[in-house]
Amino acid sequence: MEKRVVITGLGVVAPNGVGLDAFQYAIKNGISGIRHFEELERLKFSCQIAGMPNVSMELALQYFTELELKNFNATGILYGVIAGIDAWKDAGLSMEIQEEPDWDGGTIFGAGTSGVEKFRESIYKIDDFKGRNLGSTTVIQTMNSGISAYLAGKLGLGNQVTTNSSACTTGTESIIMAYDRIKSGQAKRILAGSTSDSGPYVWGGFDAMRVCTFRHNDSPVTGSRPMSQSASGFVPASGAGALVLEDMEAALARGARIYAEVLGGDLNSGGQRGLGTLTAPNPLAVQKCIQNAMKSSGITAQDVDVINGHLTAT
């Protein structure tokens, strides 16, 4: 028998708000979080505006030990751990350290890159013949699955622990993968989400491709203009988002607050064929994905009243 899947926890680390309350306030009051960065101007980037979450050392120490933060230089993992743990707590799930792993709990937490700044730091050391000084945490900070490894260790997760990576669809894909695993009865709760590193070494390639806006360096908050005729490119930014997906029966049994039910979803690819390319979607694939998502959810187009589009302002 297929299980019903619900969302019981949320966490967010965004340029316009770290934590649900701050983020919700920013969204309701039109606060974008996009600002001008002197570092990007110094490096002569065409686009000198960006979004970066404001995470203080004081806040970081609420999620990491001082030892863990020694030689730590991976913003994507920082953002992802904060969002993930916040979502877990928001779901009312235990943070108490147990001897046994949580065999029914796992994480599928996506990332596009991991520890780019740590890579840069390490490259300089290696080139200076100081490879032995890299430190014992360099690998976990720079491997793509570092975020899921950190979360699994902090939460004692014993079910599937995976990092997916599919460019702009990474976060949505993690939710669908988590949904499928719970629906099939292979897990009772999965922490799903995605995260992204910040800084010029992540954003530089996009700036070189000339896909970032260059017309709004003097007016950062007007830079991102999706669906506008005056759109001149996207604004680079970083952060993380997380959701706890849970077997509805288990959630109800423990009296959890339920935000929503996940009815279904679909994943496909345009194969870079027809009108599709590496960056441009294949229109036929988009149609098929939407149609199959509605079919798997048991709804019709008339039932859809909100569309959260992938609006990059390119």
PLM feature spans:
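Conserved beta-ketoacyl condensing-enzyme motif
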Residues: 7, 22, 28-163, 195-205, ...
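Short beta-strand segments
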Residues: 11, 108-110, 165, 190-196, ...
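Glycine-/small-residue-rich "gating" segment that lines the acyl/pantetheine channel
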Residues: 128-135, 176, 180, 184, ...
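Short polar catalytic/cofactor-binding loops
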Residues: 10-17
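Condensing-enzyme catalytic core mediating Claisen C-C bond formation in acyl metabolism
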Residues: 4-8, 31, 35-36, 219-299, ...
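Active-site-proximal alpha-helical scaffold in enzymes
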Residues: 80-93, 144-147, 152-155, 160-195, ...
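Short glycine-aspartate micro-motif
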Residues: 5-7, 104-108, 188-192, 224, ...
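Active-site-adjacent elements of ketosynthase-type condensing enzymes
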Residues: 46-55, 114, 118, 197-224, ...
